[in-house]
Amino acid sequence: QSPKDAYPYDISELVKDAYPYDISELVK
């Protein structure tokens, strides 16, 4: 089973849902 099967949505979209701010800004 590929990760895409387990997570059919885009992981980046999931991150945006969890962290509505830009991750690059968080890293700064």
From Swiss-Prot:
Its EC number is 3.1.-.-. Keywords: Hydrolase. The keyword Phosphoprotein does not apply. The keyword Coiled coil does not apply. Belongs to the 'GDSL' lipolytic enzyme family. The lineage of its organism: Eukaryota, Viridiplantae, Streptophyta, Embryophyta, Tracheophyta. This is Putative GDSL-motif lipase/hydrolase-like protein. It is an enzyme of class 3 (hydrolase). It comes from the Eukaryota. GO terms for molecular function: hydrolase activity. It comes from Populus euphratica (Euphrates poplar).
